[in-house]
Amino acid sequence: MINRDNKKAITKKGMISNRLNKFSIRKYTVGTASILVGTTLIFGLGNQEAKAAENTSTENAKQDDATTSDNKEVVSETENNSTTENNSTNPIKKETNTDSQPEAKKESTSSSTQKQQNNVTATTETKPQNIEKENVKPSTDKTATEDTSVILEEKKAPNNTNNDVTTKPSTSEPSTSEIQTKPTTPQESTNIENSQPQPTPSKVDNQVTDATNPKEPVNVSKEELKNNPEKLKELVRNDSNTDHSTKPVATAPTSVAPKRVNAKMRFAVAQPAAVASNNVNDLIKVTKQTIKVGDGKDNVAAAHDGKDIEYDTEFTIDNKVKKGDTMTINYDKNVIPSDLTDKNDPIDITDPSGEVIAKGTFDKATKQITYTFTDYVDKYEDIKSRLTLYSYIDKKTVPNETSLNLTFATAGKETSQNVTVDYQDPMVHGDSNIQSIFTKLDEDKQTIEQQIYVNPLKKSATNTKVDIAGSQVDDYGNIKLGNGSTIIDQNTEIKVYKVNSDQQLPQSNRIYDFSQYEDVTSQFDNKKSFSNNVATLDFGDINSAYIIKVVSKYTPTSDGELDIAQGTSMRTTDKYGYYNYAGYSNFIVTSNDTGGGDGTVKPEEKLYKIGDYVWEDVDKDGVQGTDSKEKPMANVLVTLTYPDGTTKSVRTDANGHYEFGGLKDGETYTVKFETPTGYLPTKVNGTTDGEKDSNGSSVTVKINGKDDMSLDTGFYKEPKYNLGDYVWEDTNKDGIQDANEPGIKDVKVTLKDSTGKVIGTTTTDASGKYKFTDLDNGNYTVEFETPAGYTPTVKNTTADDKDSNGLTTTGVIKDADNMTLDSGFYKTPKYSLGDYVWYDSNKDGKQDSTEKGIKDVTVTLQNEKGEVIGTTKTDENGKYRFDNLDSGKYKVIFEKPAGLTQTVTNTTEDDKDADGGEVDVTITDHDDFTLDNGYFEEDTSDSDSDSDSDSDSDSDSDSDSDSDSDSDSDSDSDSDSDSDSDSDSDSDSDSDSDSDSDSDSDSDSDSDSDSDSDSDSDSDSDSDSDSDSDSDSDSDSDSDSDSDSDSDSDSDSDSDSDSDSDSDSDSDSDSDSDSDSDSDSDSDSDSDSDSDSDAGKHTPVKPMSTTKDHHNKAKALPETGSENNGSNNATLFGGLFAALGSLLLFGRRKKQNK
């Protein structure tokens, strides 16, 4: 149904909410009998869920002051804002929101709220009381002033004890209870344009009539509204501007408006956007989120009273979003959108004209809505949206009273609110205590489930009976016929479960798993009776709690409304035999009350459009069509701002056209044109012809009963300018461009904007020219990069177009090119440095004419950064040089030659002194050949000289003499053998070590001489003489063995060292002399003589061996004495010489063998 009064449009009246119908539960509903065309708005306490209101009444047939402490004070609530007679003959009428003209007798419009009430009475009275009319205030006052959505409010009935309780016998006549009603916020209606159509009756039973002219009906049937959505939209638009404070509201047929139970949703859309693919939560910007419980005063969620949790969120949709993309809305895990049904389909997001922006689906497991964007986001930009969601405490996750922190989220951005969950208490009167709620509505099967707690306080109750009535019950437990009913008969499903003494019932009054309780249904087969739409169960005397689950049928009204009510009561007897009653009534109503009088549809409100054209104004005159080159401009963003501040944007088409429709008469709108890049707005109001001029970048227009297609604007291309000029070689270095000075090519030039951002880079051409093009007015910075081998010349020496502006300069463009930004460079001269390294023999640090250069000294050149840029060596004259150097700072490093010492530095003029091992030098436009250094030899030496001389002389002299003489003589024989062996060995080892060292530091000289002489002389002489002679024989044997060994070892080691630092000289000399002398002499003489012989022997042996330095030998002096040997027997001499020869030969062989 259409309830334009409750829609929030994107106008000054607020934002349109695409509402779903709701169910609500309450005890009483009152209203006028005026029937208006349209769909009954089904109110409720949850999104898509009928929520039962529990109104409990108790009565006692007997006065008993002693039981007053068990009684509870009852305050009944009503939801009407109009005053009507409350009696059973006045059925609840459909709320019909029509646009009708007021009549003289017209009652003010009221909108009945639907909520589940727990209005309970527990009284017994001695006399009946008159039924008072409900005090109802019109609910349209708020609607007229604020044009807000109707919000469902529910209030839990207080469970206070009623101290004014009287009793009467159970046989007395019941009295009527006094009912006080309380206004509540009206319920919002559903935007029919985004609803799914419902089946319609076969006949047209609703017409829209004009209250001021009832004879002229407007022939708008439900079928027409269903089949002609445009007609319905027109009704909506027509209705949206109606003053509902004085006029009835037009509604659409039920067949077009889907019923939603407890579906308190409001959607409001401000601006369209663009889409991507898949989830685009990151492209959704949440601007505001709030959570409110009920009226927001105490944050107490009275769950049995249907107090809702309202979640409001506002967000914008990025222009990158595309059709098919999705976003998410998350409910808290402890709430549920629908309290009675499984229909959780979320409402579509629409714009003020009813066009769908996104469609939603609900995931019950995750309690998340996923919205999928339509092509709306491809057509529009800068979309802003608002969403209001109503939910209710999920009794499955929150079975008992508690405190919660509820968290909701839009596109993953969360907000939280602390709430207290409050459940109803049982109604108690004497031993009677009972409570009930509706728990499930099945619209397809047309059934309603009710759960009843019997004796939840586990009192000892006597003669207990429980009635289940297909209608409400009054304060005395009597059946009260009237609006709303169910069917209670033998086909009604009634289950009874016993609660064990150790089991606690959840305070939520809702059981999800009955298997935990004892099923005692069969025990009531003979204790259950049906009569007049009432079932009675006889419990007898009990002290346990029981649960009754009732599933009853209901009959929908002809227009599909849910007019459902069902009551239950418990009665017990006290010790006096009087009955105590306690009762609850649960019901669902499906109407909004309005004031009396017939109404007709107000004439359709006409909607208008604005727009037109964006063009390129080539001649900048602000008038269309004055230049043949003018053309339309496509893709220009145009934004419409509604009176309430919301916006909607489109882009011009290929013909430069744009248009906004669905605008209301008398309202003021603003149209803004975004200036395209590279363009400027043209002249405004260049002519008096409003359809040919330009209205500028922003224009405000008021709709005056007609379309306005004259809102045009023009743009012209922003002029572009050039900047640049010249880079030249300033050969004379005067900073002025001369005619004969050439340009420098390939010089890099960088252009920056006023923020320092680089916007261009180029290089000069062959003639030194450069240029930056397509520049806007503004300040720019130009930077020239110094070419290799050049130096910047002086700057700003003359006129701006002929001088050099330096390496960095600022250029200003103001409606003209700027070609004056030049820079000059001259070739950077190259320089040399170096000089001389010499041997400073006199150590005075000055170069003398007699002192010579040192060759091959390594010289290293470093730049200012310490980087090695050159290495060379001095030539044969000690000269070195580095060339091709720029002006700058350098360091020269001399590598000290081995064995030399650094001479003193800086002793005289710079070109003749020594500058040291490291010299810092600065070249400024000239060579520098003053960088010298000198070295000398130091006197002291650090020398280690080791001379090791080893002389070994081994002499072996062996003399073996064997003399055998055999003489046989009859004579007398005298034989004399004399052998003399003399071995003389002289070994002389001479070692000479000479070390000459000159050093600046220590000198260590070590000389080690080892001389070893080994002489072995062996002389063996064997002489055997056997003489037998008769005669006299004289035998003389002379043996001389001379062994002369001369060993001369001469070692000379000379070490001469001169070093600046540490010198080590080691001389090792080894001389080995081995001399072996062996003399073997064998003499055999055999003599036989008969004569007398006289033999005399004299053998002198004087060998001498002398070894002298340098091998000087002395001759042996001659032996003095007689040498007359003439008388020696010749034979003896022969034998002696033979023996000597043998000895010498034997000795030579022996020596050779060694």
UniProtKB/Swiss-Prot annotation:
Q: What is said about its interaction partners and assembly?
A: Interacts with host complement factor H/CFAH (via C-terminus). Interacts with host complement regulator C4BPA.
Q: Please explain the role this protein plays, according to its UniProt record.
A: Cell surface-associated calcium-binding protein which plays an important role in adhesion and pathogenesis. Contributes to the resistance to killing by innate immune components in blood and thus attenuates bacterial clearance by interacting with host complement factor H/CFAH and modulating its activity. Also inhibits bacterial opsonization and killing by interacting with host complement regulator C4BPA and thus inhibiting classical complement pathway activation.
Which residue ranges does the record annotate as region Disordered?
A: 54-230, 904-1129
- Say which species the protein is native to: Staphylococcus aureus (strain USA300)
According to UniProt, the name of this protein is Serine-aspartate repeat-containing protein E
Keyword Secreted assigned? yes
> Mind telling me which residues form the propeptide?
1121-1154
Compartments, record wording: Secreted, Cell wall
UniProt-listed InterPro entries? Adhesin_Fg-bd_dom_2, Adhesion_dom_sf, Fibrogen-bd_dom1, Ig-like_fold, LPXTG_anchor, SDr-like, Sdr_B, SDR_Ig
